[in-house]
Amino acid sequence: MSYEKSIADNDIRIAQICENAKKYKIGVVLTAFTKGSKQPQNSAFVINKSGNILMKYSKVHTCDFADERDVESGKEFKVCDFEGIKLGIMICYDREYPESARILMLKGAEIILVTNDCGSMQPRIRALSTRAYENMIAVAMANPNGDNAGCSCAYSPICWDRNGKCVDNTVLLADDKTEGIFYAEFDMEAIREYRNREMLGNTFRKVEAYSQLLSKEIKEPFIRDGQNR
């Protein structure tokens, strides 16, 4: 993706999607390559039912080992208020790093929406279930169908009932080949009640032990080309 082909935030195509969101009274997460300061950014726009853009998020964890080495990384994770629900966004490779969902939880997100486009999905959907569990936050991901791909999914943070009995937190899990519109419904009242009583998320973290998370030092076996861009 070249900078010249990336689009501005006021591009007519974005405006058209906003108009349709208002017309059909639906929320939309729209992704596009947008103009960064010097390079394109992989961005997502959250549009409300009135056709207003609530938030623009640019992907933080760009795939610097592949074509996205020429894409400018976003600098922060963001949360917006959509119809009384706090929404956060992750884009594809963001979900490989637990810090992404953790920061969104700390910023107040109740649901994380994940726009995705990759294969080898089985370990990745299990990781999303874990992100929901450990942050007490709902997670939903959309991924294009295809061999070894697909698996659009949604997970509730509710993993056990009041008696401590485990419950399946899978709300939706598509197969890899089926193409379609998938619906996932979260019981926000139940989720909020669960978050108010259980002991995960930001309840008993020991942040004084976490300073190493901010170090930029990389040692073997994790040294790769294109790091610390």
Tell what function each PLM region has.
Residues 79, 144-229:
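C-terminal beta-strand edge segments of enzyme domains
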Residues 6-8, 62-67, 82-85, 102, ...:
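Short capping/connector residues at structural and topological boundaries
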Residues 32, 91, 143:
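A cross-domain feature marking catalytic cores of carbohydrate-active enzymes
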Residues 25, 33-36:
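Glycine-rich, aromatic-flanked loop segments that form ligand/cofactor-binding clefts
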Residues 1-10, 40:
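Metal-dependent catalytic neighborhoods of phosphoester/phosphodiester hydrolases
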Residues 2-3, 85-86, 112-114:
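A short, structure-level motif marking secondary-structure boundaries and short turns
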Residues 19, 35-107, 116, 120-130, ...:
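Active-site catalytic loop in hydrolytic enzyme cores
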Residues 6-29, 96-183:
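CN hydrolase (nitrilase-like) catalytic-core segments centered on the catalytic cysteine
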